[in-house]
Regions:
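Conserved, well-structured ligand/cofactor-binding cores
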Residues: 1-467
């Protein structure tokens, strides 16, 4: 064991631990979610990138000796390589606006830098977590900047997975292009369409979300490095904000910009609110699609049964032979969680006071969780459901021609009153719309067949003068 001290006194730290006393206190204070920082390595790596950029800027300004800078930069590089993930053990939800997370990073980097300099862990007179690793910084600029970088990177993975799901939907749209089915509004028979049109609509609605996610993720490119505590830049040199932002842009390969007003930027969480809203919107659309898949596959004998979902597992402990739509159900539940996370982000953002929002840890946790869950859910939906969907083509077609909704297609040719009468008679007698129209002599068979041609019913067509 080694002894470390802080404002509150001394504590024993395991000799082999790279974290220090402030991390230890955070572990003891915040046993909240059981979800530790190492489960979101993207935030760890972003923090190390921030510390690298700060060290470079401080070296450039003559505030950090080159030997110390080199040790800190190498330690950060090892953190980014994932060598110390297990040392990042603070809870994702914590008081202090992210100070515990920031200090966890400062201590790990400082202790590794000490080893590289030939010193023992805890010999902070040679490389100090606050005086050197956190030089010219505050949690209030370093932490939100790291969160933004990590979320921006996470958005790339999210949209990449979304692209794959869109492609899978579009492939099914082509596969099912010739399958006629009944469209429905308010769960009642409406007018015919193709099953391919159904899946193409899914592809298009999801495609819209790529642009919206990317637009809102771009808000993360404005950062407040150099703001330090509240945005006034106390304890940083003139020009530091510009230097550290330039270095961080180079390190991350991202075009970051310094906020025009650092006081405003330090207290504002609007970018998180906007991005969370776009993530929620994607979740809502995915859930609606999964509702449709469950409904269209209902049955197999007493439901709609237009499509078959791949059977994944036995569905009941009491009903033999039952197979449930477990993959869409899981995606529905993911969407519910993401929608709840969006509300958390909204409430936490609203609760900010004066010059700082102290609730950024739960905002970050919610958004990282939403990104990860949606990535996993979309991959699961694509691989274990959508790609294996098959159609019951004959059943789909039979339902169209047995549906009273078919009367809408002949409405322009026979008139609304006659069409209404046909619908009422079909409902009362059980006869088909097709047979009743021929029986009443309203149209010739040739004309009726032309109107009820799948191409005519599923796309706009030229109407005759009498129509």
């Amino acid at each position: 064991m080694r002894i470390e001290h802080d404002l509150l006194g001394e504590r024993e730290i395991p000799e082999d631990a790279y974290y220090g006393i402030q991390t230890l206190r955070a572990i003891e204070n915040f046993s909240i979610t059981g979800i530790k920082l190492f489960l979101y390595p993207q935030l760890i790596y972003a923090l190390a990138q921030v510390k690298t950029a700060a060290a470079r800027a401080n070296r450039d300004m003559g505030l950090l000796p080159d030997t110390l800078y080199q040790a800190i930069e190498k330690a950060c590089a090892e953190v980014i390589a994932g060598k110390f993930n297990g040392e990042f053990i603070v809870d994702m939800v914590q008081g202090g606006a992210g100070t515990s997370t920031n200090m966890n990073a400062n201590e790990v980097i400082a202790n590794r830098a000490l080893e590289l300099l030939g010193h023992k862990k805890g010999e902070y007179s040679y490389c100090h977590p606050n005086n050197h690793v956190n030089l010219s910084q505050s949690t209030n600029d370093a932490y939100p900047t790291a969160v933004k970088i990590a979320l921006h990177d996470g958005n790339k993975k999210l949209t990449a997975e979304l692209e794959k799901l869109i492609q899978a939907m579009r492939k099914k749209a082509h596969e099912f292009a010739g399958i006629l089915k009944m469209g429905r509004t308010q769960l009642q028979d409406a007018v015919p369409m193709t099953l391919g049109q159904t899946f193409e609509a899914y592809a298009v609605t999801l495609e819209e979300e790529i642009q919206r996610l990317n637009e809102n993720a771009c808000l993360f490119l404005e950062i407040n490095m150099g703001a330090t505590a509240i945005g006034t830049g106390i304890n940083s040199e003139p020009g530091y904000a510009e230097k550290v932002t330039a270095h961080l842009s180079e390190i991350t390969g991202t075009s970051l910009v310094s906020a025009p007003n650092l006081i405003e930027a330090t207290q504002d969480t609007g970018s998180f609110v906007m991005y969370s809203s776009s993530v929620k919107r994607l979740a809502v659309k995915l859930s609606k699609i999964c509702n449709d898949l469950r409904l269209l596959s209902s049955g197999p004998r007493c439901g709609i049964n237009e499509i078959n979902l791949p059977p994944m597992q036995p569905g009941s402990s009491i009903m033999p032979g039952k197979v449930n739509p477990v993959i869409p159900e899981a995606v529905n539940q993911t969407a519910f969680k993401v929608i709840g996370n969006d509300l958390t982000v909204t409430l936490a953002s609203e609760a900010g006071q004066l010059e700082l929002n102290v609730f950024e840890p739960v905002i970050a946790f919610s958004l990282f969780q939403s990104q990860d869950m949606l990535c996993n859910a979309m991959a699961t939906l694509r691989k274990r459901c959508v790609e294996g969907i098959t159609a019951n083509a004959e059943h789909c077609r039979n339902m169209v021609y047995n549906s009273i909704g078919l009367v809408t297609a002949v409405n322009p040719a026979i008139g609304y009153e006659a069409a209404t009468d046909i619908a009422k008679t079909a409902l009362k007698t059980g006869k088909s719309v097709y047979d009743l129209i021929l029986e009443k002599g309203l149209l010739t068979k040739e004309r009726l067949d032309d109107i009820l041609n799948p191409e005519s019913m599923t796309h706009p067509r030229k109407l005759t003068a009498t129509e």
